[in-house]
């Protein structure tokens, strides 16, 4: 049913910091407006990880199962996996693009800082297991060179490599959900995720 007389997607945002009672109170007040899904806001803003995940788990157990759950502003790969294991369906975050601008590249082998001198002569692919061709084609030394000379193409390569990594991770998780095999294995590989 349209609330405002026109078609819209409305996700009420559940607030309340890391206070479980305030979160549940807000959730109960917002449920009548949850026509399309529910957003979890106000997390990943400086609190420790465990209280954040405790709130996500609490809300995951109390939100409707038939609507998407959207965790706002959370973007580290390990946080995505942990939130998915607690029932979250959707995310948004600037982290892949922002970190790419600073030379941090998410790869299937782990996170690298392309500005480190170790990559100056590294002719191996940026990410040999990426789903995008140029991450498998261009070398780490070439990407580092582009960053050193402030060539915009380097930022594009880094950003798209990071976004591809995230898409690959989410697709892998989707496959594991479909096969009923999703577990904490993803987060037990500290070198793989930041």
Model-derived features with residue positions:
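Acyltransferase donor/substrate-recognition loop-hinge adjacent to the catalytic core
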Residues: 1-3
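Glycine-rich phosphate/ribose-binding loops and adjacent secondary-structure elements
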Residues: 5-126
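Short amphipathic alpha-helical interaction patches enriched in hydrophobic/aromatic residues
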Residues: 42, 174-177
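Structural signal for well-ordered, non-membrane alpha-helices
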Residues: 60, 171-174
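Gly/Ser/Thr/Ala-enriched C-terminal appendages of enzymes
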Residues: 94-171, 178
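Long C-terminal interaction/binding lobes of large macromolecular proteins
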Residues: 182
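Single conserved hydrophobic/aromatic residue that forms the stacking wall/gate
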Residues: 185-194
């Amino acid at each position: 049913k349209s609330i405002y007389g026109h078609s819209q997607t409305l996700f009420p945002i559940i607030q309340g910091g890391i206070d479980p009672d305030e979160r549940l109170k807000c959730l109960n007040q917002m449920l009548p407006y949850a026509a399309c899904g529910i957003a979890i806001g106000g997390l990943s803003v400086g609190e420790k990880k465990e209280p954040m995940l405790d709130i996500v788990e609490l809300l995951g157990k109390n939100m409707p199962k038939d609507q998407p759950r959207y965790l706002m502003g959370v973007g580290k790969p390990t946080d995505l996996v942990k939130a998915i294991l607690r029932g979250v369906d959707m995310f948004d975050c600037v982290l892949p693009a922002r970190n790419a601008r600073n030379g941090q590249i998410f790869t299937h082998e782990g996170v690298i800082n392309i500005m480190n001198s170790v990559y100056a002569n590294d002719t191996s692919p940026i990410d040999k297991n990426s789903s995008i061709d140029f991450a498998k084609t261009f070398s780490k030394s070439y990407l580092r060179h582009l960053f050193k000379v402030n060539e915009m193409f380097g930022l594009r390569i880094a950003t798209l490599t990071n976004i591809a990594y995230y898409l690959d991770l989410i697709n892998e998780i989707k496959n594991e959900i479909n096969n009923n095999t999703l577990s904490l294995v993803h987060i037990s590989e500290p070198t793989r995720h930041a």
